[in-house]
Amino acid sequence: MKYVIAGLGNPGPTYENTRHNIGFKIVDALASTILFSQERFALRAELKYKGRQVILIKPQTFMNLSGKAIKYWLEKEKIDIENLLVITDDIMLPFGKIRLRPKGSHGGHNGLRNIEEELQTQNFPRLRFGIGNNFPKGRQVDYVLGQWSSEELNVLPEKIEKAKQCVLDFVFLGIDRAMNLHNS
């Protein structure tokens, strides 16, 4: 079995430690000792997990155009859409809470919206990582593109580790069992 795990984020050092780049951070945790290579539309790494081939990508097309990279890698690797997992930030979830779903709407997230447009479906698995919504009205962009607070940074590694385990359970156990284990 082959999987594509796509962590959403924006390329470059300006965005590296922002809330919006949590997808990149989780994919980095999965790759821990594996180097990413610059390939078409994405940084790519590959690992084996319990007999499964897992292709990790960090689209380099910027968040709002992530669909182009994801579509390319699904087609290139001949991977079915149910073996795709998109990891993204979510302001509607409290900080650190994760929610795994087999499908759903973009919920106003422009990266997910673009993926839906490129794939022409909402029926793909996604893991949403809560970044909270502690911002004044009209300041959403500043918040999601902002750095983590010191309080968040203190517990972020633990939260990323839980998200990483959810991804591995998705790959090995399937989406239903992974949802039962990780959604609360």
Question: Which residues fall in each region the model found?
Answer:
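Hydrophobic alpha-helical segments within soluble ligand-binding/sensing domains
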Residues: 108-111
